[in-house]
């Protein structure tokens, strides 16, 4: 399971209280006992200092990358009614953020937060994809409404939190008493409330103080003789008044021997009130000691020094001070109610806290009987050893497992996908080229659309004059202008993206109307480059290049040839980031995304088989087709399909065929079904082909001619190098037609099952290719086996109906679970909040949503250039160093110079573009979007670095690094120093 611990209880007002201490101790124990599970922490970025201390506490237990922070609008304290809109917006933003982390279980350490601070804790009302667990400390305010809920604002806040708690899938009670309260008062099923108990920090243990240490301790806290001790806070239910009155009823000799020390923080009004009560009860001025706050170390020493610890509370969720005192070896007596008997574990150490006489009598029994005190000390140490944070954590994790198991079992009994209602199919805009456009994607769409229309009412969005496929005549057809005006009326939008000019118009449409992207070619650099002059988009390619690949790629393009840049860089990030979901047809495309944009970037992509139609049923018999094409019945025809170009390795096939036995068999022919690409490769290939009379090139092949050659072929060879992330439809067509096919394991072809083809190594040798040709040529049995296997594979996985159903599932899953769809739902839910809102609040909410987005891309090296770059006449060496950083950025990183302004850090784009000679791009110096894992790199002293980096960035997980700018920093040795700084 992925378990997320919401530890805001360790950040704000609860941080130094019992709840904060409990939450931290339990979370640390969970981290120690989470083997087999993935544990992550979620924190509130509004408290950056506490984030740093929590990161330090979990160092070595939880990877830094698994500690997340989120941002919400502030202020959000519910005590102020003016914060109502921000509170509700913040709860929605937090829930959305948590869902984006894909947890199985979220544990909220403390739900009753946020009354006067900016902690946001709630259990969403509906639509949870994960289980929520909440720690249940007690329900004392509900049980004692007259004391705690008299203020209407407090009551409204508390009851709202109760309703949220009741929605939780699991409550982790800190005692058996608290568990029973949850079951009875919240009317919850027993299986939803689990007692995990509590424990104390190992620092609470017996210690021996030297006489002078003891004397100094007592003197510092105003204690002058042996003492009776209480700690645990000043509150009505703590019953300190009853304790003072009970102490006053002790025999005079005991009061003269023992002071009463109340050890805890105390406000002046409470101090004056308790001192008046003591005087009224007849106590001398020094009988009662109100110490005020004491450190943990002094608290432990006081526990060890006290003659008796008394815990007279009227109600507790657990009673941690009593356990701490026992763990230190103090004799402990306490109330006989709620959870306190569980903690103390001894019936004769209990008293009725509502009876002053009972409290006093119990105290006197211990103080007058040393043997009784010794027995309580020994029993207390034994009892305290029964409580363990590791055991608490193990119980909690077991409860998580059981709760998650129930959800998983429920999921297995439901249908994963609900078919679209026959009454109304969703309306889908389909943006793609279609026949007669000479594009493989056009044919692909024509094949897919009839089956996809079983699931959607489809309308075609075209950038062509007409469609000549009769099967598509019933689909409504519109141009881009119509779509711009009517896109909002569609339920779904699908874009078929490829790397040709037929897709150039889609970039603007996608920017204006986001939708599902089917990425046929991972590299889109070709179409983007050609779109600049054809669609009047100046610098479109360079802007896309920078946004996808950074200044290094931009500098390369400036210094070299555009063609080399187009070949080197995919340039597709704008399309991918704007898509509401992405479908690809090979895992190779996913691997490319991970290579270029980070290991998690394509986590939500769907890999679907490429739709291919079965062999056409009206094909005449094979001998007749071969005769029509000019071949004899016993000829052996080897075909290769597609445009002839360098990446298709056609020249290597020609050479291998000429060197093989096939070239010497007059029955054998090699046919390239396609046209030769222009350029030097094409010229050389024509000369090579001309050297043998039985090597043919058809030129552009119509659909009918293409299918005829598929029907006629005895074997096929489809090779590839320098894949651009595309999937070869020709390979699949060959298999579908039962043509034994040779491929090399490059790109998507590596995913064709080995039993269905002859698969050479990616970097195959000429001998291997020649051997494969001769093996197929000489073994009709092998050809027959491969023919059957290939056709069976295609029928099972690539049929039109099967692919259309997978399309439907992918589109609907994206609409249901995809990040863009979830963000749109979040925005809609925020817009529906029924509370007064101001424009600054809306801006805060928008900024929070943007900041909370997952990074999932290349990491940034944020170079602070204020030290030198913004000063006129900066030294050329300094500019050279920055240029070297840009060009030598380690793999997986991009260098982004940044600068400060009055509000924070901005990207120094104008400066950097001028530096690399591309000032014409005129990109905006936008606010820096710092993400976890980024590095802030300052060139200068540690002092400047410490001042410069925003604390929120540190909290977010941005690493702070300094690179000394000295004479040793030269461009030629920079990369090693840069790598060292990133470690």
Each predicted region: which residue ranges?
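Carbohydrate transferase catalytic cores enriched for Leloir-type hexosyltransferases
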Residues: 1-625, 629-653, 658, 667-690, ...
């Amino acid at each position: 399971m992925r378990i997320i611990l919401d530890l805001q209880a360790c950040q704000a007002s609860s941080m130094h209280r019992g709840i904060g201490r409990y939450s931290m101790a339990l979370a640390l124990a969970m981290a120690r006992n989470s083997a087999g599970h993935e544990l992550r922490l979620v924190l509130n970025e509004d408290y950056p200092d506490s984030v740093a201390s929590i990161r330090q506490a979990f160092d070595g237990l939880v990877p830094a990358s698994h500690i997340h922070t989120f941002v919400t609008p502030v202020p959000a304290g519910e005590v102020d009614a003016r914060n109502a809109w921000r509170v509700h917006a913040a709860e929605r933003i937090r829930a959305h953020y948590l869902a984006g982390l894909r947890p199985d279980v979220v544990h909220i350490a403390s739900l009753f937060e946020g009354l006067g601070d900016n902690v946001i804790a709630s259990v969403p009302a509906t639509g949870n994809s994960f289980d929520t667990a909440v720690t249940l400390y007690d329900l004392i305010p509900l049980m004692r409404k007259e004391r705690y809920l008299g203020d209407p604002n407090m009551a409204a806040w508390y009851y709202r939190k109760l309703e949220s708690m009741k929605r939780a899938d699991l409550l982790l009670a800190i005692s058996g008493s608290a568990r029973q309260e949850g079951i009875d008062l919240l009317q919850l099923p027993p299986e939803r409330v689990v007692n995990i108990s509590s424990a104390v920090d190992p620092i609470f243990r017996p210690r021996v103080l030297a006489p002078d240490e003891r004397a100094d301790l007592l003197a510092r806290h105003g204690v002058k003789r042996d003492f009776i001790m209480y700690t645990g806070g000043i509150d009505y239910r703590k019953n300190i008044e009853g304790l003072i009155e009970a102490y006053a009823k002790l025999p005079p000799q005991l009061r003269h021997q023992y002071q009463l020390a109340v050890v805890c923080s105390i406000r002046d009004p409470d101090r004056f009130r308790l001192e008046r009560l003591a005087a009224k009860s007849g106590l001398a001025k020094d009988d009662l000691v109100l110490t005020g706050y004491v450190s943990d170390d002094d608290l432990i020493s006081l526990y060890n020094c006290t003659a008796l610890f008394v815990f007279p509370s009227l109600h507790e969720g657990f009673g941690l001070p009593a356990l701490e005192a026992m763990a230190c070896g103090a004799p402990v007596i306490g109330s006989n109610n709620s959870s306190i008997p569980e903690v103390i574990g001894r019936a004769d150490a209990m008293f009725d806290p509502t009876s002053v006489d009972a409290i006093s009598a119990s105290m006197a029994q211990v103080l007058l009987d040393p043997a009784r005190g010794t027995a309580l000390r020994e029993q207390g140490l034994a009892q305290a050893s029964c409580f363990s944070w590791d055991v608490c954590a193990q119980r909690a994790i077991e409860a998580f497992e059981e709760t998650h198991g129930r959800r998983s079992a429920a999921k297995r009994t439901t249908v994963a996908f609900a078919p679209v209602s026959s009454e109304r199919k969703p309306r889908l805009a389909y943006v793609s080229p279609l026949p007669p456009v000479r594009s493989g994607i056009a044919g692909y769409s024509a094949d897919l659309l009839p089956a996809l229309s079983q699931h959607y009412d489809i309308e075609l969005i075209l950038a062509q004059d007409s469609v000549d496929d009769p099967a598509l005549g019933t689909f409504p057809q519109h141009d881009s202008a119509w779509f711009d005006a009517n896109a909002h009326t569609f339920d779904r939008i699908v874009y078929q993206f490829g790397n040709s000019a037929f897709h150039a118009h889609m970039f603007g449409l996608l920017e204006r109307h986001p939708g599902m992207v089917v990425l046929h070619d991972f590299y889109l650099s070709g179409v983007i480059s050609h779109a600049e002059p054809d669609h009047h988009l100046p610098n479109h390619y360079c802007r896309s290049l920078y946004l996808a690949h950074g200044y290094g790629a931009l500098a390369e393009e400036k210094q070299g040839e555009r063609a080399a840049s187009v070949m080197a860089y995919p340039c597709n990030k704008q399309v991918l980031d704007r898509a509401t979901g992405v479908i690809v047809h090979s895992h190779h495309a996913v691997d490319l995304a991970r290579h270029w944009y980070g290991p998690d970037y394509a986590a939500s992509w769907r890999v679907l088989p490429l739709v291919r139609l079965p062999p056409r049923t009206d094909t005449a018999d094979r001998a007749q087709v071969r005769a029509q094409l000019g071949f004899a019945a016993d000829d052996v025809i080897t075909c290769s399909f597609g445009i002839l170009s360098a990446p298709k390795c056609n020249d290597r096939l020609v050479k291998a065929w000429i060197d093989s036995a096939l070239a010497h068999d007059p029955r054998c022919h090699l046919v390239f079904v396609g046209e030769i690409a222009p350029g030097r490769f094409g010229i050389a290939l024509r000369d090579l082909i001309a050297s043998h009379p039985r090597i043919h090139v058809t030129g552009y092949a119509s659909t009918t001619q293409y299918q005829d050659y598929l029907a006629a072929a005895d074997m096929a060879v489809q090779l590839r190098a320098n894949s651009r992330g595309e999937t070869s439809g020709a390979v699949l067509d060959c298999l579908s037609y039962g043509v034994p096919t040779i491929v090399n394991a490059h790109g998507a072809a590596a995913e064709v099952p080995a039993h269905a083809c002859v698969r050479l190594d990616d970097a195959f040798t000429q001998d291997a290719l020649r051997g494969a040709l001769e093996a197929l040529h000489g073994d009709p049995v092998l050809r027959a086996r491969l023919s059957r296997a290939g056709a069976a594979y295609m029928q099972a996985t690539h049929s039109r109906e099967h692919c259309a159903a997978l399309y439907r599932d992918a589109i609907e899953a994206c609409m249901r679970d995809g990040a863009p769809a979830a963000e749109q739902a979040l925005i809609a839910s925020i817009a529906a909040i029924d509370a007064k809102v101001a424009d600054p609040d809306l801006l805060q909410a928008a900024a929070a949503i943007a900041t909370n987005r997952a990074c999932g891309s290349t990491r940034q090296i944020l170079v602070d250039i204020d030290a030198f770059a913004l000063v006129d006449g900066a030294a050329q060496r300094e500019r050279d160093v920055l240029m070297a950083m840009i060009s030598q950025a380690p793999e997986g990183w991009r260098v982004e110079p940044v600068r400060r302004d009055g509000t924070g850090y901005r990207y120094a784009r104008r400066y950097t573009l001028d530096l690399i000679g591309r000032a014409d791009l005129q990109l905006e110096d936008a606010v820096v979007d710092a993400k976890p894992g980024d590095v802030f790199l300052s060139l200068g002293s540690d002092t400047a670095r410490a001042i410069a980096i925003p604390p929120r960035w540190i909290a977010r997980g941005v690493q702070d690094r300094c690179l000394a700018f000295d004479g040793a920093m030269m461009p030629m040795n920079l990369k090693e120093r840069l790598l060292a700084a990133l470690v």
